[in-house]
C-alpha cells in the first residue's frame, strides 16, 4: 500500500534578511554572496491514524521517503548560464557537485505571506510608495524569516542554528556518534537532481510521539555556507564569492503537478506457497 502526505508549508529564509518568502512557488538554496535555507513541513496525522486503527499494524514495515522536485531545467545548455539574482542586483549560477543536509526544526513556525526574496531592479516598480496599491505589494516581514519562526518569537540562533553549530553537528552526523539534529544528507552531482530522502526513522518517531513534528530544514553543508570565511574555505572556491550558487525546488505553491510529498509504503506482501510440497516433511 502506498500513501502520499503532501507538504503543507514551505519558506526560504535568507541570511541577514527579515523578508518572508512563504508564498513563492520556488524555494532557492544559495551559497556564495548570500546564504539561504529551506524550511518545509508535512502533516503525519493521517499515517498515525492508520497505525492506530490497525490499517498498518506493524510500524517496522513502513518506509517513508521525502520527494521534492528540482525546479532546474533538464536542458544541459542552461547549466552554465548566469542569471539575475533573486536577492539584490547580483548574478547567480547553478550549483553543482554539492551536498545538502536536512535537520529538524525545533519550534513552531508560520509560513507567512511574502513572495519576493528582496527588492531588485526587476521588481522595484512594485514598491513605488507613491502608489498606495503597490507599496510592499510582494514583500512581507511577517511570519518565518532568518531571525524569527513567527511574529513575537526568536529562533535558538539566527537562521534556526548557526553555521558553527551545524558544523559541529555535521561532524557528529558523519561519525559513529550521530547527531540529534541532522537527520539526513543527499549528494547532488549535476545540480538538477530531485530530493529523494529516506526519513523513515524520523517519521516513525513523529507517529510514536517520541519527537514533535515542527518540520525539516534543508541547507548546504557548513563548508559551503562558510564560503566567505577564507580560513575555512580552500583556494579553489575563491571565485565563488563573487556571485551566488543556487539550486531551486518546487514548493507546495507550484502551479504544476510536481507538488512535494512524503511517500509512505507499507510492506504487506504475503507469499502463497501452498503449491509447494516436500515429501517426508510437515508442510504448513
Over which residues does each language-model region extend?
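Secreted, disulfide-rich extracellular signaling modules
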Residues: 1-284
Amino acid at each position: 500500500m502506498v500513501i502520499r502526505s503532501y507538504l503543507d508549508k514551505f519558506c526560504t529564509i535568507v541570511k541577514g534578511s527579515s523578508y518572508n518568502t512563504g508564498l513563492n512557488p520556488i524555494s532557492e538554496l544559495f551559497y556564495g554572496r548570500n546564504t539561504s535555507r529551506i524550511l518545509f513541513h508535512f502533516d503525519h496525522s493521517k499515517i498515525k491514524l492508520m497505525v492506530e486503527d490497525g490499517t498498518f499494524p506493524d510500524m517496522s514495515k513502513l518506509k517513508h521517503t521525502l520527494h521534492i522536485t528540482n525546479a532546474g531545467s533538464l536542458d544541459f545548455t542552461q547549466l552554465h548560464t548566469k542569471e539575475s539574482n533573486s536577492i539584490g542586483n547580483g548574478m547567480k549560477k547553478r550549483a553543482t557537485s554539492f551536498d545538502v543536509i536536512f535537520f529538524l526544526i525545533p519550534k513552531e513556525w508560520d509560513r507567512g505571506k511574502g513572495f519576493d526574496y528582496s527588492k531588485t531592479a526587476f521588481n522595484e516598480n512594485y514598491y513605488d510608495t507613491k502608489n498606495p496599491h503597490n507599496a510592499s505589494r510582494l514583500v512581507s516581514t511577517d511570519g518565518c524569516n532568518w531571525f524569527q519562526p513567527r511574529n513575537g518569537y526568536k529562533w535558538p540562533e539566527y537562521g534556526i542554528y548557526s553555521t558553527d553549530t551545524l558544523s559541529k553537528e555535521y561532524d557528529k552526523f558523519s561519525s559513529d556518534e550521530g547527531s540529534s539534529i541532522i537527520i539526513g544528507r543527499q549528494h547532488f552531482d549535476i545540480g538538477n537532481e530531485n530530493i529523494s530522502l529516506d526519513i523513515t526513522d524520523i517519521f516513525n518517531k513523529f507517529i510514536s510521539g517520541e519527537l514533535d513534528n515542527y518540520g525539516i530544514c534543508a541547507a548546504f553543508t557548513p563548508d559551503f555556507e562558510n564560503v566567505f570565511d577564507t580560513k575555512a574555505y580552500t583556494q579553489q572556491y575563491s571565485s565563488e564569492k563573487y556571485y551566488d550558487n543556487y539550486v531551486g525546488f518546487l514548493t507546495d505553491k507550484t502551479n504544476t503537478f510536481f507538488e512535494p510529498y512524503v511517500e509512505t509504503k507499507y510492506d504487506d506482501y504475503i507469499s502463497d506457497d501452498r503449491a509447494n510440497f516436500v515429501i517426508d516433511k510437515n508442510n504448513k
